[in-house]
Structures are given as C-alpha cells and as structure tokens.
C-alpha cells in the first residue's frame, strides 16, 4: 500500500518488468546511463541505501550509454518532480529523455528530446520519495511517489486560461461530498459541499445569458471518495476556459460534463484523496486545479539489519502484499529478490559474484489470506577466495507457515519475537552475496 504517499505515472512503454523504489530517507543521488535514450537508472538516499539498477540489460557494449550522476544537496535541496519524453528506440517504446526538478534548480535534460511524447507534472508542495516503472534492456517507463511538504497537501494544476476575476482556493476538513456543475458548451460554473455541510462557490457563472444546465455529483464518503479530475480547456466565446470536466473516484468516473474541446489534461495518480480545489472564475470557469493528500498516512518501523558490514546498503518496500521471494542459496544466501501483488519486481540484492550464484528457491505467499510476519536465520563467515561475513541461512514466517531454512545454518542466529504485524519490506547490505538483512513492519507491531 502507498503509506503516506501518492503514485504519479508511469509514463512510457509496456515492455520490461515492473519495478519500484521507495527511499527510507531523502533521495540524494540519481545515477543514469544515457545516450539516445535512458538506458538505466538507480538511486541512493541520505542513509546510503541504494536501489539497484533498473533497465540496462542490453548486453551490447555500444548500448551501455554514458554515466551521468545527479547529486542533490539534502536537506537544503530536495527532489520535487520530473519531466521528460518517451518514444521509439530500436523498435521499443521507452523513456527517451529525463529532467529532475528540485526546489532549487532543474538537472537535465538528459537523453534525446527529438520526437516522441513529452510529459511533465504540474505539481507544487511535493517531495519525491521514490520511483516506479518498467525496465528491461532500457528504461521502459518511469513514474514517481510523492509526499506533501512539509505536511499537508499537494497542489496539482491549475489547468485552463489565465483570465478570471475571482480566484478561489479551499481545502475541506472532511471530504468532497457534492459537486454542482453548470455546463453547456463549456463549464459555466462549479460549486462544492463537504461532508460537514459547508458550501464553497459557485465559481464562475457570471454570464446571465449562458448559465448552463445543472448536473450534480454525489459522493458517499464512506465507500467512495474523490481521487482526481480530468478534462479539457480551450476557446469558448472568445475566452480560454475549462470546456469539460470529469471527476474520478476510487469507484468510478463521473462525467464528462461540458463539451470536450481544446487541450486535454489528466493526472495518472494513485493513493490520493482530493481535499480541495483552486482556480479562477468569471463569466465561466476559467481554470481549475486540485489539492490532494495521501489516502494512507501510515508509516513503518525498521528492525535490524543482522549480518556483516560488507557490500552496499539496499532497501525495498512493497506497494502491496509481498507474494513472492526468490532466494539463491548454497552454503550461504547468495541473493534475494521480491515481487508484490501489484506485479512490481524488486531489484536483485546480492549475487554479484558470477562464479558463485547458488541454487534458485522460490517462496510463494498466498496474499491476502497469507502474509509475511517475520524472518529468522543465521549469519557468519563464508569463504570464497576471501572470507566474508554474510547471511548464511534464512527462513520466512507467515501467519500460516514457515518457509525454509534456505542456505546452511552456521554462525550467529537471529529471530524477531514479533506479533500481530505485516512485513512491508526489507533492507540490508549486499554485494557478491547477501551481507545483511532487516525488515520493515507496520507501526502497531509489538516487539
């Protein structure tokens, strides 16, 4: 689940495998390989955790691209958005160019901006806390996870024209319950009521000869809530105004209202709750934008890691329930990878030594009736030319069963005496092997 964050995107093609990365601390470094397209991308956060590499699987040397490193000087600087383009490259629909926008500057554009479709996010008051997308030979698709900064709501938009005598701007304390739209060839006016009975507007509707036809959207608030909007804006009677609107909830799409014409807009957004609107109105609805907040503001607790200090730090947080764990093991744990029920694959953590990859083992978890609750295992010395302190064995405990142990139990044992929780993700250190491992659990856990 999207704990305290909102998913925007992805943009790009459908090739490659799903992946996602959510930083435990602020993102401080982005590493891309690029030439005529974005070959691969990886990330590092302020704690030193690295994400693994997404894309970059084309084995040809001339397709590796040039390395570009973006350093973000947190805490005075933080990443707030991205923009770029996607299009055809070697017969694949992939990310062609990328720019990274912070509160201080824009880094890029990297890649080729010629041809293809461009994308950007009209967003304010946000911090990028992670990325998601698809990757294979190249970076096929890319989106972001965002949180409000410092606390509260994120602003999207406005879309529409620059005119309008009356600016409006409101946020509700409950939920958007009723939306009253007057429309004809455009959106003449709009008004709102929240779950506490407070009314906002109407905004627009000052042409007495063209007030439009009234339509009403009613939202329950318990079973249904507003998550986003989409629409069009363009010329209407010589004014650049909002010409059509749709209101998207977790259940359905209401609309479109008005007449779709001109430039279209939409926000590919998940995990959101619309808490207010902003824009301008006059004769008609000149422009409109939304305030959103994460639907789920719950966080997680980090436990561990156990193991050695070698390798590089890594972390993985699932979008939904973890339903598959891929373990390569021999006399120790060589590598780990994860998959969740949204289809996202993690990077592979460990397994860098090509001469010692181990045997593949797969744990399948029948989520949601079965869910991961804890891990246990051992760590100690493992020798392959050099001596490493690594995770030597691992078991995975669910509410129904224990899977493992995998590897060979030796050295120091560890376990987590933990109840009534769900494992949301993993963290640790990895290089040639799995050097260390810990878990992220929900905050109501009793340890």
Swiss-Prot record:
CDD domains (UniProt xref): Jacalin
The annotated thermal profile of this protein reads: Hemagglutinating activity stable up to 50 degrees Celsius but diminishes with higher temperatures and is absent at 60 degrees Celsius.
Q: Which GO terms describe its molecular function?
A: D-glucose binding; D-mannose binding
**UniProt protein name:** Mannose/glucose-specific lectin
Describe the family membership recorded for this protein in Swiss-Prot or TrEMBL.
Belongs to the jacalin lectin family.
Task: Give the activity regulation note.
Answer: Hemagglutinating activity is slightly inhibited by alpha-methyl-D-mannopyranoside.
Keywords, A to Z, come to:
Antimicrobial, Lectin, Repeat
Indicate yes or no for the key word Repeat: yes
Report where it is expressed, by tissue: Expressed in seeds (at protein level).
Question: One Pfam family of this protein, by short name?
Answer: Jacalin
Show the InterPro entries listed in the entry.
Jacalin-like_lectin_dom, Jacalin-like_lectin_dom_plant, Jacalin-like_lectin_dom_sf
Q: Which residues form the Jacalin-type lectin domain?
A: 5-148, 153-294, 300-443
Instruction: Quote the record's note on pH dependence.
Output: Optimum pH for hemagglutinating activity is 5-7 with activity decreasing quickly at higher or lower pH.
Q: Has keyword Nucleotide-binding?
A: no
Gene3D superfamilies named in the record = Jacalin-like lectin domain
Its function, per the record, reads:
D-mannose/D-glucose-binding lectin that also binds derivatives N-acetyl-D-glucosamine and alpha-methyl-D-mannopyranoside. Does not bind D-galactose, L-Rhamnose, D-fructose, lactose or glycoproteins fetiun and mucin. Shows agglutinating activity towards human and rabbit erythrocytes. Also displays antimicrobial activity against L.infantum.
| Cited SUPFAM superfamilies | Mannose-binding lectins
């Amino acid at each position: 689940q999207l704990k305290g964050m909102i998913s925007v995107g992805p943009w790009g093609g459908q090739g490659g495998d799903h992946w996602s990365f959510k930083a435990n601390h602020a993102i401080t470094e982005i590493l891309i390989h690029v030439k005529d397209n974005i070959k691969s991308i990886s990330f590092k956060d302020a704690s030193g955790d690295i994400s693994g590499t997404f894309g970059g699987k084309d084995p040809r040397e001339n397709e590796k691209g040039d390395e570009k490193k973006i350093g973000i000087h947190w805490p005075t600087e933080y990443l707030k958005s991205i923009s770029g383009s996607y299009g055809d490259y070697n017969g694949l629909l992939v990310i062609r160019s990328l720019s990274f926008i912070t509160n201080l500057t824009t880094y890029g554009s990297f890649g080729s901006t010629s041809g293809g479709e461009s994308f950007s996010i009209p967003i304010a008051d946000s911090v990028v806390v992670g990325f998601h997308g698809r990757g294979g030979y190249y970076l096929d698709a890319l989106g972001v996870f965002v949180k409000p900064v410092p606390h509260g709501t994120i602003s999207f938009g406005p879309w529409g024209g620059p005119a309008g005598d009356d600016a409006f701007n409101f946020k509700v304390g409950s939920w958007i319950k009723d939306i009253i739209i007057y429309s004809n060839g455009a959106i003449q006016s709009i008004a709102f009521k929240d779950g506490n009975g407070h009314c906002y507007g109407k905004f627009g509707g000052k042409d007495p000869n063209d007030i439009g036809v009234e339509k009403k959207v009613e939202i329950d608030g318990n079973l249904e809530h507003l998550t986003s909007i989409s629409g069009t804006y363009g010329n209407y009677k010589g004014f650049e105004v909002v010409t059509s609107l749709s209101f998207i909830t977790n259940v359905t799409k209401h609309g479109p209202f008005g007449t779709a014409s001109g430039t279209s807009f939409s926000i590919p957004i998940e995990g959101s709750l619309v808490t207010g609107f902003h824009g301008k109105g006059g004769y008609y609805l000149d422009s409109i934008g939304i305030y959103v907040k994460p639907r789920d503001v719950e966080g997680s607790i980090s436990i561990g890691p156990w193991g050695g200090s070698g390798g590089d730090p890594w972390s993985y947080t699932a979008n939904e329930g973890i339903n598959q764990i891929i373990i390569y093991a021999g006399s120790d744990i060589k590598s780990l990878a994860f998959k969740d029920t949204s289809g996202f694959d993690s990077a592979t953590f460990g397994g860098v030594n090509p001469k010692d990859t181990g045997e593949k083992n797969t744990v399948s978890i029948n989520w949601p009736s079965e869910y991961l609750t804890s891990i246990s295992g051992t760590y100690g010395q493992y020798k392959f030319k050099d001596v490493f302190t690594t995770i030597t064995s691992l078991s995975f405990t669910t509410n129904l069963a224990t899977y493992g142990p995998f590897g060979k139990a030796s050295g120091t044992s560890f376990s987590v005496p933990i109840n009534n929780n769900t494992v949301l993700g993993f963290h640790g250190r990895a290089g040639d092997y799995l050097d260390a491992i810990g878990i992220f659990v929900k905050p109501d856990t009793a340890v």
